[in-house]
Amino acid sequence: MKISIGVREIAYFLYASGDLSQDFFSNASARDGIMAHQYLQHKYKAEDKKEYFIKSDIKINDYELELSGRIDGVLKEGVEIVLEEIKSTRLKLEDIDIDYHREHLAQLKLYGYMYCDAEDLPSIKLRLTYINTRTYDTTYFDLLITKDELKEFYYDSLEKYIDWINVLEEKRKDRIDTIKTIHFPYDKIRDGQRDMMKASYYTLSHKNILYAIAPTGIGKTMATIFSGLKSMKHDREKLFYLTGKSTGKKVAEESLRLLIDKGLKVKALSLTSKAKSCLNDTPVCDPAKCIYAKGYFDRLQQALVYAYNSYNLFTPDVIRELAKEYNICPFEFSLDLSELCDVIICDYNYVFDPKAHLIRYFDDSLYKPKLLIDEAHNLVSRARDMYSAEIRFNSIINLYNLLKDKGHLIYEDILRLEDMLKGYERLMIDQNIYYQPLFDNNIYDIFRVIREKVELILQNDEHIDNRNEIAVIYFDIVGFLNIADIYSEAHRFIVEEDNSDYNIKITCLDAREYTYNIIKNKVEGCVLFSATLYPINYYMELITKGDGKYINLKSPFNPSNLKILIDANVSTKYKDREKTIDDIIDDSNVVLNTNKGNYIIFFPSYKYMELFLEKFKNDEYQIIAQESDLSEEKRIQIFEAFKDTKTPHLGLFVLGGSFSEGMDFIGDLLKGVIIVGVGLPQVNLINNLEKDYFDNLFGQGFDYAYTYPGFTKVIQAAGRVIRSESDRGIVILIDERYLYNIYKVLMPEHWQNKKYIESPFDLKDDLVSFFNGGDNNG
């Protein structure tokens, strides 16, 4: 049996040692490491070779092993050949010796034998070089070693690794066999679900891009996961299920649990954030202060082997328990464990965010990831946020204070920064804000200098007070500089004056270049799905630059079970709200009094909701108004309150908030929703900058910045009503703009049972007819 293995895999599995240091804790480290590598390699002579690909085939037991890797440098020094392995670090070089991380030297020795064998050399010089990513200072360790010594190490390593290969191969056979034979876990495949599975399977098998408009009830989670698994044919393929909400993760976990219970033998892992997974009261990513970072690599192999042999589904709770048992960092353990898994459930940022994406999968050709992107309509705004950055001037002042006696080192830099910001303040015409299309490189230089000085302070003083607080601001600066490094025509540089503070922003108006690059060039097939991809061309353009195909699946639910009643006689525009609030109250009371039960009214803003509350009276309902700083715990409490059938509840929520999606009000939990307005985002500088940007690009600035994002929120809110085949309910849309043709065109196909009403009397008649089971076709 032929098996392909990376040399680095063998070295790290067998010989990894030491602590989790700052070198392992951020993508900034990895990016800086790449630049440091390139700096050294750029100094190579013409006859030297960099990133030298080497491959070796060897038969051991029943396995034909294909080992491969890239040697950082093959150098000629006189008549001597030197193999160089470069490792970057933030540590002081005097603290590093040749055994700093044993896996580094092991990797180099494996390369050494492969090169000697290929070139028939009796001996060779190995050079392990460490470069500091801040100063670019280097230290190196040379080892002159014979081919025979390397051969002994090489074969000894492979003999040890074969035991692990035996375990992996047994699980691999089980995975391949059960993926082939596993049947769909439900007796019945829903309407639309089969079409979605066929399209998803074809897309992932042919490395294409698919958008699926999949209404509620199709069973899109199981459809995509099942077809995604069926499309997996090779060892290095990994299926990523991306979702932005904890509820979405739970559904994906349960779908995989069901398949595993039915006999599927795959390894699946649900990844959660470092902050949520940390076993300490406060995250302290420092081996001097964290027992889970100290000696992490010394205990990692044992933990990996036990976990892999004992579990199929690694939920966050399972990972935390394993981490406690082996005294290792749960977050880093989950990342290392993910390399042994077939399916990874995670947030969008682990794929798309330059500050957090998983480098091991998306910057390395070793793996072949496939993407399933749930609630893909959220990716547009999420990606813009990922490629934006901001930092407050007061944070830099706070950094100065936290550094105490070392604060003077950045004092002059702070003064320079303050002078520049005051200059921008003088340019502000109104709204205390200034923007320009070009980034200010002088501000970049100041932040870069501050970053370098703080990094040096942290390196040289391991026991500095306020280390964690300093590190938080330090990484904010690092993140800001990283976004500045990829500043483009789609970014705007903004300075905002706010209560004697300055907010310095890099705002991304359009992230499609970045999302498309990842989907097109870093993965092998992508399915994006949501019930609210309207209009589809908007989402395709802003995620994959129009590339890909789409399917529009029919709702599995009887469209007559959802009644859409539209009151287009009321203006909800800002200037008219005081005048028309009584009309909204009248419509609301008609709905609430005609058929008592739980209802939700969605408003465009908290201020509009408060205006309604001031005048609204209805003693028969328990009113629950959403708070602006709603916690997850409070959100669940509100959801649970709707299950109390003794008293009807009226929820007053904000469009686009946590109650607009991801909450399943099944059965009698919700009779209907009233949606006030068309969901337009607030008119502000950022949205107007987007409008101007897309006007120049497509000539549809207002629609791209306001209309489409707004109506997506309307569709999401309306989607709370029908969550199962037996549900019946109503949606009331209130706004004169629903008469506009653009909104009529945007309405989903399953909104067939809709009617425009003339007055509250018409509204009552239609409601009575619907709830009594009368003519539902308007």
List the predicted regions and their residue ranges.
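Conserved RecA-like P-loop NTPase helicase motor core
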Residues: A568-K579, S628-L739
